[in-house]
Amino acid sequence: MIRRQTNDRTTNRRRPKLWQNCKNIRTLKQIHASMVVNGLMSNLSVVGELIYSASLSVPGALKYAHKLFDEIPKPDVSICNHVLRGSAQSMKPEKTVSLYTEMEKRGVSPDRYTFTFVLKACSKLEWRSNGFAFHGKVVRHGFVLNEYVKNALILFHANCGDLGIASELFDDSAKAHKVAWSSMTSGYAKRGKIDEAMRLFDEMPYKDQVAWNVMITGCLKCKEMDSARELFDRFTEKDVVTWNAMISGYVNCGYPKEALGIFKEMRDAGEHPDVVTILSLLSACAVLGDLETGKRLHIYILETASVSSSIYVGTPIWNALIDMYAKCGSIDRAIEVFRGVKDRDLSTWNTLIVGLALHHAEGSIEMFEEMQRLKVWPNEVTFIGVILACSHSGRVDEGRKYFSLMRDMYNIEPNIKHYGCMVDMLGRAGQLEEAFMFVESMKIEPNAIVWRTLLGACKIYGNVELGKYANEKLLSMRKDESGDYVLLSNIYASTGQWDGVQKVRKMFDDTRVKKPTGVSLIEEDDDKLMMRYLLSSEPESRSRGRIN
C-alpha cells in the first residue's frame, strides 16, 4: 500500500490567526515592526512564525525572509528549514545551497527535513556536484534510511540522469511511496528511455494525477506523440495540469494547430484554463499567425481580469500577447499592449523589439532608442533583436554601430547568434567580402549556421568562389546536410556553370547525405523558425583556441 506523505512537519500545522491573516508583504513588515517595538525578536518561536510567513505564505517576500534570517544571531534548525524550503520551492532556487552553508557556519546541525529541501534545489537546478556532496552529508549524518530523505535522493539522482544510483535507492522501502515511483518514471522519460519509464508506470501500484501527468509529459518531451495521446485518453481524472501538459507539449513539438484542438476539448470537458494554458495558446497563435484566435484569447484575459484579481494580468501574459500580435503582423496592437503594461521589465522591451524586427524593423530600432533614453539596461537578447532589425531593413551602418555599442558601452560579449545576425545583415546587403572577413575575425568558432548563412548570400549574389569556400567549411563540420549541396549547386546554376552542378550532384550521391535540417538566416523561408533558433538556449560555439 502506497502511503501519502508530506515533506515537512509544518505543512498542515495550525497557525495563529494573526499569521493566517498575513497575506501581503506590507502587513508582514507591520507585524515585524510591532515585534521589534515589543521586544519579541529574541523569542525564536515568534520569529519562526515571521520567517515562515516571509518564506512560504506571503507572495514575493522571500528576499525579505533572507534579510530577516541574516539578522538572527542564533537561529534554530526549524527557522533554517523555513528559509531553505522557501528558496527550494521558488522560481530561483540557487540561493538554497549558500543558505545551507551559512547555516553550517552558524553551528546549526541539519535534521532530516533540511536535506529534503537542499536536494530538491539541486534537483531543480541539476547541480550534480552539489547534490553528490549533499548525498555524502546525508550518509555522514545518518539520514540515508529516512524515507523522506531517500525520496529526495531518488528525485535528485533520477532528475540529473544518475539512474543507476537512483535505481539502487529505489528499494522495497522506497517503493512504498508514490513520490519515488514518479521520480523514477520521470527520470527515465526525461532521458528518452520511454520503454523503461512505461514499464515502471505499468508496475506502479497506485497511479495518481502526478504519475499520469509525469508520464504524459515525458512522452511529449521525447516527441512520442501517439503514446502521449494514448495515455491522455486513458486517464479519466484529468486536471488542468494534464491538459496543460498536452497543449504545451504539442506546441513545443511543432503541432500548434493540434494544441488549439486540444484546448477545444478542454473547454468541452468543462475545465477552465489557467495562466500556463493561456501562455501556451498564445504561443500557438504566434506560430500559426492565427490573429483571430489570439484576439479572442485577449478578450478572455480582459474579461477575467475585470471580474477578479486574476493571475492572467501578470507581465508574462502581457509579454505573450505582445509577441503574438507582433508575429501575427498586427504591429499597432502589439505596441498598444506594450504601452498599457504598467510594470514593464526587460523581457517586455525585448519581446517587442524582437517581435518587430521582422515585420516592422524601423519600429524595433525606435523602441531600442526609446529604451536607451529611459535608461533601461539591455541584454544579449535585446541586441539580437535590434541587429536583426537592421538586417531586415538594410541599415548596415546602424547594425555595425549597435554591434560595437553592445561591447563598448554595455560590456556584453557577442555570442554566436550576434555574429550570425551580423553575417546575415552583411550578406543581405551584398557585402560578401566584408561578411567573409567578419567570419574569419570572429573570436569564437563559427558554427554551421554562420557558414550556411554566408553560403545563402553567395547564392543570391552569384559568388561562386566564396560559396565553394563556405561549402567546404560546412562539409568539414558535418557531411549529412543535403541543403548545403543544394545551395552550392544553385550558385553554379545561377552563373551557368553546369559542369559545377554535375560535380556537386555527384558529391551528393556519393556521400548519401540526409535531407536538410539546418537553418540559413538568409535562405530560411520560415522567419518564425529562424527566430526560434536565435532565441533558443542552444550551447554556444567554442572560443577559438580553447581546449575542452
Swiss-Prot record:
NCBIfam families the UniProt entry points to: PPR
Protein family (similarity comment): Belongs to the PPR family. PCMP-E subfamily.
Coiled-coil stretches noted in the UniProt entry, renumbered to this chain: none
Alphabetical UniProt keywords: Repeat
Pfam families the UniProt entry points to: E_motif, PPR, PPR_2
Keyword Repressor: no
Matching InterPro entries: E_motif (IPR046848), Pentatricopeptide_rpt (IPR002885), PPR_At4g14850-like_plant (IPR046960), TPR-like_helical_dom_sf (IPR011990)
SUPFAM superfamilies per record: TPR-like
Residue numbers spanned by region Type E motif: 450-525
Lineage of the species this protein comes from: Eukaryota, Viridiplantae, Streptophyta, Embryophyta, Tracheophyta
Disulfide bond annotation, renumbered to this chain: none
UniProt keyword annotation of Zinc present: no
Renumbered ranges of PPR repeats: 76-110, 111-145, 146-176, 177-211, 212-238, 239-273, 274-308, 314-348, 349-378, 379-409, 415-445
GO MF entries: RNA binding
Protein's name according to its UniProt entry: Pentatricopeptide repeat-containing protein At5g15300
Classification via PROSITE patterns: PPR
Superkingdom as given in the UniProt entry: Eukaryota
